[in-house]
Amino acid sequence: MAHEFTWDHVENPDKAIVFTGPGSNASGFVDALDSISDTMDYIRIDDTQYEILLKDHNKGTALTYVADHLNISTDDCYAFGDSNNDISMFKAAGHGIAMGNACDELKEIAEYVTDSVNDDGIYHAFKYYHLI
């Protein structure tokens, strides 16, 4: 049974992950997201998963905040990711490293593509960048 989505029960959200059923028609859901686009952003992870977060609050702004707090340049930051919700972080970091199992969209903008997590990808990237 399909349910109509409303924001009536949501108070002051910071972030949400929403899953839709396989083969479901998410167009109504996307329309609801578009209706709050002045305060919230959303990232379509895949056909059944959306990440919803406060406008201009994402992994990229988080990386910038932490780097500023630690008084280091984002040029000296290494970001590892595997999904399109990591794109903002890759754009903020000096070095964006896509895991071997990453989505194609992320691999296209990555500075380097390493092995998957299961194949010690982070270790191999550290070796590649002479960090260890």
Where do the PLM segments sit?
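Acidic, Mg2+-coordinating phosphoryl-transfer loop and its flanking beta/alpha structural elements
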Residues: 63, 73-110, 115-117
